[in-house]
Amino acid sequence: MKAIAINGSPRKGGNTEHLLKQVLAPLTAAGWDTEFVQVGGKHIEGCKACYHCFDTKDARCGQKQDGFNDCMEKMVAADAIILGTPTYFTDVSAEMKALLDHSGLVSVANGGLFRGKIGAAVVAVRRGGGTHAFDTINHMFLMSGVIVPGSTYWNPGFGREKGEVDKDDEAARNMADLGQTIAWLGEAIHNHANRRAAACVRE
């Protein structure tokens, strides 16, 4: 199975990246194909509501912005999508917001490309505002039919300077548990789908 972690922070090697990789580690250990994708720092224009995606239905955005369509292709191919963002004025980064708006609309325009996938939000925060950023990501997931698993708590990690989040032991435990939960849930969904397919063949 495939899991993709998308980093919405423009600061490479920063706290958001650290958290995302903590989630991916148990998935890799469970035999999943995992991939880390850097979106923060790339030029992704905001959605212009041109609805070109409803006309073409090719799972792509008609705007030729850098990086989005490649990222969308990876999201569609994944069984689990983990989106990470720093907290900017109590919300997600500009790149993450553009990704959410584009991908959510393209998914809907193409009949629900994200429906039935697993999705998780991960947030790096210095002090406050992380809950709102967490909600912003989950709003897109829940409106797209994505299955959002819980963990030991919500999914923030606290820190400002690069690597500071590694001192947040509770966050580390939570991210590890989140990765393990995604692995378990993915296997359960996969097994259920196989049983349904086998039943259809017998019928």
Residue ranges, per PLM feature:
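Short, hinge-like loop/turn segments at secondary-structure boundaries
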Residues: 51-55, 101, 167-168
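Helix-loop-strand module that forms the ligand-binding subsite of alpha/beta enzymes
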Residues: 62-147, 153
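Glycine-rich phosphate/pyrophosphate-binding loop and the adjoining helix
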Residues: 1, 29-30, 70, 147-203
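Cysteine-cluster motifs in flexible loop/terminal segments that predominantly coordinate metals
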Residues: 42-75
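Mobile beta-alpha loop/short-helix "lid" or hinge segments that flank ligand
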Residues: 38-45, 111-113, 142-163
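N-terminal beta1-alpha1 ligand-phosphate binding loop
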Residues: 2-32
